[in-house]
Regions:
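Cap/lid and interdomain-hinge subdomains that line or gate substrate/regulatory clefts
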Residues: 1-90
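A glycine- and small-aliphatic-rich helix-loop capping segment at beta-alpha/alpha-beta transitions
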Residues: 6-18, 124-129, 260-271
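Conserved, well-ordered active-site substructure
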Residues: 243-245, 249-273
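General beta-strand structural signal in soluble alpha/beta enzymes
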Residues: 49-56, 80-84, 107-112, 117, ...
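Short, flexible loop segments at boundaries between secondary-structure elements
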Residues: 111-139, 270-273
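A glycine- and small/hydrophobic-rich beta-loop-beta segment
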Residues: 132-230
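Active-site pocket-lining segments that scaffold enzyme catalytic pockets across diverse folds
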Residues: 78-104, 110
Length: 273
């Protein structure tokens, strides 16, 4: 992802595509049609006043004084749009933010994950650490929980199953879940099947691969119900054979599976790729 002259770009298959033209912008609950970040801010809060902007050119040139001055003169609750195309530019931004904070400024961030890595001053994750982490599972099989149903996720899922033909794929019928409102026995049966599968190999637990919505429910409400069902399945897995590792795909899914499915309250983040 890159932001240049206020436009947020996404690199897809070697081609830069404006974020508003990606499938993520067509989300039924969080979608948007704004080309620039300034337009996006205006559509969300309505006439927020003058929006300051820091250019990628200033960040690329390492003009710390100019970048810091933009932050220092920003008034209370003023929006500042950041343009950046690489981590070196984000490092300059972080340095300017820290200088401005030393002078009393306080900032609230609405960002992509790349900024978190820059703000925490982390380098790219060491793949050796990931390999060592995976090898600590004492040979137990893994569980992949897929709640996201975007086109990108489907491509990734198909690629994984194609390259790992021995992995077992089980599906939660989300439309039946949403239509019934009470899917307890089916969730227990699916949990048993996942547990039996983990005894023999790794398992993919996926939701129906198309977006589904319950009667008189918004997509967001439906998504929360589906996520809760995945959590219930995970919580009912047999305790004598837990998965050696877990991959959770989807923003809501990854949070809920970790926090509510496995009761994890604190983790170590190895890095942002």
């Amino acid at each position: 992802r890159f932001t240049v002259e206020g436009v947020h770009w996404v690199l897809q298959n070697g081609e830069l595509v404006a974020a508003r033209d990606t499938e993520f912008a067509r989300d039924p609950d969080f979608g948007y049609d704004d080309l620039t970040l300034e337009e996006w801010v205006n559509s969300k809060v309505g006439a927020p006043g003058e929006i300051a902007e820091i250019s990628a050119t200033d960040l690329a040139g390492g003009d710390l004084l100019k970048v810091t001055s933009v932050l220092n003169v920003a008034s209370d609750a003023q929006f500042v749009v950041i343009n950046a195309t690489n981590y070196l530019q984000l490092a300059t931004l972080v340095e300017a933010i820290e200088e401005s904070e030393r002078q009393g400024k306080v900032f609230i961030y609405r960002t992509g994950p790349s900024f978190v890595r820059a703000r925490a001053k982390l380098g790219p994750p060491d793949l050796a650490d990931l390999t060592q982490f995976a090898s600590s599972s004492t040979g137990r099989h893994g569980l992949v929980v897929v709640g996201s149903s975007t086109e990108l996720t489907n491509v990734q899922l198909n690629e994984m199953v194609f390259n790992h033909s021995r992995i077992q794929v089980l599906e939660l019928n989300t439309q039946a879940l949403l239509d019934s409102g009470n899917y307890g026995p089916e969730l227990k049966q699916l949990a048993d099947e996942v547990g039996q599968g983990l005894a023999k190999g790794s398992v993919v637990l996926q939701t129906t691969r198309s977006k589904t919505c319950g009667p008189e429910m918004t997509m967001a409400e439906s998504g929360r119900m589906i996520s809760q069902a995945l959590v219930e399945i995970v919580r009912q897995l047999p305790g004598d054979n837990p998965p050696g590792w877990v991959i959770a795909k989807g923003g809501i899914t990854s949070h809920d599976i970790l926090k509510s499915g496995f009761d994890v309250s604190m983790t170590t983040v190895l890095g942002q790729a």
